[in-house]
Every structure is written in structure tokens, then in C-alpha cells.
Amino acid sequence: MAARLCCQLDTSRDVLCLRPVGAESCGRPFSGPLRALPPSHPSALPTDYGAHLSLRGLPVCAFSSAGPCALRFTSARCMETTVNAPRNLPKVLHKRTLGLSAMSTTKIETYFKDCVFKDWEELGEEIRLKVFVLGGCRHKLVCTPAPCNFFTSA
């Protein structure tokens, strides 16, 4: 199974949008308004694409060239965080948060393949955007949305 996400950051609205750009599996194909676009044309995405599912309140590390300190996954039906994820995931993310060299990313990749892409690739039920919630770090949020409880390690 292989799946890719295209990330579009709208700094004017502090919104991070992720969309599928392709899939290779025996699962059901993407359909509806989120039809895959070629990965070489990220600018073809409209500025309001998926705005209703966008994430607000990004920590400052989201804008770093090195990327965010940690990732949490959420969808319309479930919440997986560094708190309730498998035991090895919080350990790896915490090490990264502290700036230490982390273990191999194989376990993280496996975790996200199993949890994040299961609905897309195997069940074919979720056609809306999947959203990665940035958090789990010592950086302050740009603005904290009321319904979201960000995990902090510091």
C-alpha cells in the first residue's frame, strides 16, 4: 500500500490543508471532489479547497523549514494522539520534541499506514480530507481553538 498527501499552507489564514494526491493499492479508488491531482501541480489546488476541514491554531514550529515537532492524527470518526497511540509512538515523538535523535521512523510509518490510510485504502469509506493536527511540542500555538486539547510535553 502506498499513499501520498499534498500539504498546502495558507499563511494568511493559518490553515494547513492536506489532500490525497495519489494511491496505489488494491483498495477502492478515491472519488468525489477530492479526485487525485498530479503531485507536480500543487498550485492547481484552489485557495478555499477543503477550508471547512482545515486546521487552525498551528504551533510556531509548523512554519519551520525543519517541520513540526510532532503529529497527531484526527478524522471525523476517531482521534489518535501521542497519548493514546501505541507505546512506541509517544517515545519517538517525545525524543524529537526534545531535539534528540529519534529511533527509526519505520514504526511511525507503519502506524500511520495502519491507522490513517485504512479507511481510504481498504474500506473506501472516507472521502473527506484527513487532517493532521500539529501538536505535542514545547512551542506555543498561534491561537488555541477552544474544542481542541493539545498535548504538550513541556
Swiss-Prot record:
It is found in: Host cytoplasm; Host nucleus; Host mitochondrion. InterPro entries: Transactivation_prot_X. It comes from the Viruses. GO terms for biological process: DNA-templated transcription; symbiont-mediated activation of host NF-kappaB cascade; symbiont-mediated arrest of host cell cycle during G2/M transition; viral genome replication. Keywords: Activation of host NF-kappa-B by virus, Activator, Apoptosis, Host cytoplasm, Host G2/M cell cycle arrest by virus, Host mitochondrion, Host nucleus, Host-virus interaction, Modulation of host cell cycle by virus, Transcription, Transcription regulation. A fraction may be phosphorylated in insect cells and HepG2 cells, a human hepatoblastoma cell line. Phosphorylated in vitro by host protein kinase C or mitogen-activated protein kinase. N-acetylated in insect cells. Residues 68-117 are annotated as: Mitochondrial targeting sequence. Pfam families: X. Its main location: host cell. May form homodimer. May interact with host CEBPA, CFLAR, CREB1, DDB1, E4F1, HBXIP, HSPD1/HSP60, NFKBIA, POLR2E and SMAD4. Interacts with host SMC5-SMC6 complex and induces its degradation. Interacts with host TRPC4AP; leading to prevent ubiquitination of TRPC4AP. Interacts with host PLSCR1; this interaction promotes ubiquitination and degradation of HBx and impairs HBx-mediated cell proliferation. HAMAP family: HBV_X (MF_04074). Multifunctional protein that plays a role in silencing host antiviral defenses and promoting viral transcription. Does not seem to be essential for HBV infection. May be directly involved in development of cirrhosis and liver cancer (hepatocellular carcinoma). Most of cytosolic activities involve modulation of cytosolic calcium. The effect on apoptosis is controversial depending on the cell types in which the studies have been conducted. May induce apoptosis by localizing in mitochondria and causing loss of mitochondrial membrane potential. This is Protein X.
